[in-house]
């Protein structure tokens, strides 16, 4: 599988290309006099060292590119790798089934949970079918329907956030996009079951918040969370999307800054090079975080859960 190296990863890409070339030569002619295995091992070590060096000092714009990486694991990847017995549930029972949001019942270490998350799609046809992960009102109403079902059956709710934002089309506005988002914010704030939210890629504005109100909010190491994209901010403030790197730094969209502001609880570390380099390891780390969060929330009574969630929401912002 191609790793789809980003611009800032080009030195790594060049090393990996050399490794691939040597490996191919070795396969074609096993009678070569030189020790290719030794050279490949040396280059692999150099690649790991270079990756560590580059990823030790990433800027906000580089993190934003990683959050959008075409090979980055999506909601259904984590469902497959970290959960069992997933049964997808569809439709908002009012208009349609929005494929930009997926949801259903699964088991996390044997425990029934409700999973809800954005799904972007990989290939062109799937991207179009899932509207590039930008939900319409019916997507958020489907999410709310599943949350209410989880509450009735006393199941914890786990959400995965990965969207550039709610769909801004005319049809979505006509069908009540803002109302659907606002209703989700209100209803999620008073659900009587544990709610754990994790930003796994892009956390874009209200489109992310509509499934992002919870008792625990986590972010993967190279995910982002913001009220607008860096390009959108740059276009407004500097009249040019070329200023996106500057906007990304100014907006504080990365996990360490958001944890510093107490907008999130935990940062889930990613494998070296990002989640797309080792989805299985990433899923294992995420699963461990979810289990730890559930164990913590299980200690609370319903009243304590709701009071703590309320206090959390009221603490947002500056005095």
Curated annotation (Swiss-Prot):
GO biological process: fatty acid biosynthetic process; malonyl-CoA biosynthetic process
Record-listed E.C. numbers: 2.1.3.15
PROSITE patterns reported for this sequence: COA_CT_CTER (PS50989)
GO annotations of cellular component type: acetyl-CoA carboxylase complex
InterPro entries documented for this protein: Acetyl_CoA_COase_a_su, ClpP/crotonase-like_dom_sf, COA_CT_C
SUPFAM superfamilies xrefs: ClpP/crotonase
Reactions this protein catalyses: N(6)-carboxybiotinyl-L-lysyl-[protein] + acetyl-CoA = N(6)-biotinyl-L-lysyl-[protein] + malonyl-CoA
Protein location: Cytoplasm
Signal peptide location: none
Keywords per UniProt: ATP-binding, Cytoplasm, Fatty acid biosynthesis, Fatty acid metabolism, Lipid biosynthesis, Lipid metabolism, Nucleotide-binding, Transferase
Domain named CoA carboxyltransferase C-terminal: residues: 35-296
Major place of residence: cytoplasm
Pathway in which this enzyme or protein is active: Lipid metabolism; malonyl-CoA biosynthesis; malonyl-CoA from acetyl-CoA: step 1/1
Top EC category: transferase
Any coiled-coil regions, as ranges: none
Gene Ontology molecular-function annotations: acetyl-CoA carboxylase activity; ATP binding; carboxyl- or carbamoyltransferase activity
Function: Component of the acetyl coenzyme A carboxylase (ACC) complex. First, biotin carboxylase catalyzes the carboxylation of biotin on its carrier protein (BCCP) and then the CO(2) group is transferred by the carboxyltransferase to acetyl-CoA to form malonyl-CoA.
Alphabetical list of PANTHER family matching this protein: ACETYL-COENZYME A CARBOXYLASE CARBOXYL TRANSFERASE SUBUNIT ALPHA, ACETYL-COENZYME A CARBOXYLASE CARBOXYL TRANSFERASE SUBUNIT ALPHA, CHLOROPLASTIC
Family of the protein in this entry: Belongs to the AccA family.
Self-association and partners: Acetyl-CoA carboxylase is a heterohexamer composed of biotin carboxyl carrier protein (AccB), biotin carboxylase (AccC) and two subunits each of ACCase subunit alpha (AccA) and ACCase subunit beta (AccD).
Protein name per the record: Acetyl-coenzyme A carboxylase carboxyl transferase subunit alpha
Record lineage: Bacteria, Pseudomonadati, Pseudomonadota, Gammaproteobacteria, Enterobacterales
Gene: accA
